[in-house]
C-alpha cells in the first residue's frame, strides 16, 4: 500500500511537468476563434511559451478578429506570431491616452486619482521580448480620434515585422528603446499625426506609409549618440483623399534622425518637407535627410535649408547592416 501511495505521489509530481512539456518544443501552436486550434486567444498561446527559449516557436493565428490587449514579455524570445491571412487576421483594441485608468488596471493609484491612461499604456500589442517576428497579420488600435492611441509598441531588440498592416490614427507605431532595432518589410502603416515615433532604430523597406490627415508622418526622438534613427527605403508615401499637406517628420527630441531614400512620394508631401516642432534650436540638431526619391512630393528645391540631400557616396553606406551593426538579420 505504501509503495502504491509513493507511486501515486510521483505521478502527481510529473503531471505538471508533462503538461508544461507539451508546449516546450519548437512545434507550432495554433490559435483559432472557432475552436479548431489549441487555443481560442493569442494571450493563452503566449502564456504557455517557455521563458528564454533557445529554439524557435510559431504561434499560428487563423483568420478572425481577436479583441485582445497583448504583451510579449521580456523573457520570451525567438517567437513568431504569424497570421493565416494579413487582411483577415486582426488583433484589435481601442484604448487611447485620455481614457481614465480602470481600477485594478496597470496603475490603480492613477485610477483613484482619476488620471488618464497616457500614450504609453494604449498599445494593442507591446513587444518587450527580443528576436520576435510578426508576420501576415493586422494590428489595430481602433479608438476614436480622441488622443494618442498606439497599435504596436516595441521595446525589444531584433524585431522583424513582415507583411503586416498596422492601423491607427495618432502614434500608430512606437519604437520605444534607444538603439534597439526593428525592421519592417512589405507592411502597410497608416495614421494621422506622428504615427511612427520614438528613439529606436528602424528600417522600413517596400512599405506603404499612408497619411490620414494633414499632419506629420514621423516624430523620431533619436538620442545624440545614435547615428541612425528611421530609414525608409523603397517605400511608397500615399494619402487619403483630401489630404494634401503632410510633413515627412518633426523632431520629438532635438537629435531626431530620419532618412527617406529611393521612395515614391505623393503630392501630399509639403514642399518644405520637414518641420522644426516650433523650436528654431531643433534646426541645429535634427538630422533629416533624403536621397533619390521620386514622385510629385519628392522635389527638393523648396526643402528646408536645415535638411540634407545625401550624396551617392553617402547613400551607399546606408545599408541595413550598417544601420543595425550586424551582417545577418
Regions found by a protein language model. Give the residues of each.
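Bacterial Sec-dependent N-terminal signal peptides
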Residues: 1-24, 104-106
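Sequence-level preference for short, compositionally simple segments enriched
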Residues: 21-329
